[in-house]
Each structure stands twice: as structure tokens, then as C-alpha cells.
């Protein structure tokens, strides 16, 4: 239930809010796609933590690049 709600909120952000701003994500996949994938793969708690950590790294001083969601087998959240 909570997972479905969170995924819906992220999708609503992508449809309603994201188009109002110019594209600025430094990463591939984008931060919103990363959040969707992270919650889908890791669940609400860990997926949200991974997404928040990614969003905090999405700024002009970080080089960005390809940064996929880690595999569930990787025990720790890493940068």
C-alpha cells in the first residue's frame, strides 16, 4: 500500500511538476527514474534512502554521470 502510494507520488511529480522546470539532472537515469526504480527494487524504506542520497548529490559541484540503482545483493548503501 505504502509502496504504491510513493510510486504514484513520484509519477505525479514527473507529470505535473517536473515539466515546469528545465532539465537539470546530472545523472543517468534521472533522479525521478532512479527513485522509481529504487523503491520498486528495494522497497519503501531503503528505496527512499537511496533516492534521497541521490537527490542530495544532484548539484552543480558533482560531476554526475551514469549511476544505476544498486543490486539488492549489495548490503550497504554506498555512494
From Swiss-Prot:
SMART domains: Haemolytic (SM01234)
Cellular component, GO annotation: plasma membrane
Keywords: Cell inner membrane, Cell membrane, Membrane
Membrane topology, record value: Peripheral membrane protein
Main location: membrane
Subcellular location: Cell inner membrane
One Pfam family of this chain: YidD
Coiled-coil residue windows: none
Biological role stated in the UniProt entry: Could be involved in insertion of integral membrane proteins into the membrane.
Similarity-based family: Belongs to the UPF0161 family.
Protein name, UniProt field: Putative membrane protein insertion efficiency factor
Organism of derivation: Synechocystis sp. (strain ATCC 27184 / PCC 6803 / Kazusa)
Amino acid at each position: 500500500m505504502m509502496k504504491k502510494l510513493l510510486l504514484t507520488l513520484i509519477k505525479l511529480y514527473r507529470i505535473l511538476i517536473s515539466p515546469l522546470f528545465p532539465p537539470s539532472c546530472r545523472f543517468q537515469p534521472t533522479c525521478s527514474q532512479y527513485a522509481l526504480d529504487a523503491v520498486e527494487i528495494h522497497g519503501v524504506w531503503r528505496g527512499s534512502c537511496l533516492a534521497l542520497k541521490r537527490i542530495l548529490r544532484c548539484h552543480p559541484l558533482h560531476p554526475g554521470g551514469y549511476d544505476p540503482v544498486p543490486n539488492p545483493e549489495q548490503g550497504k548503501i554506498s555512494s
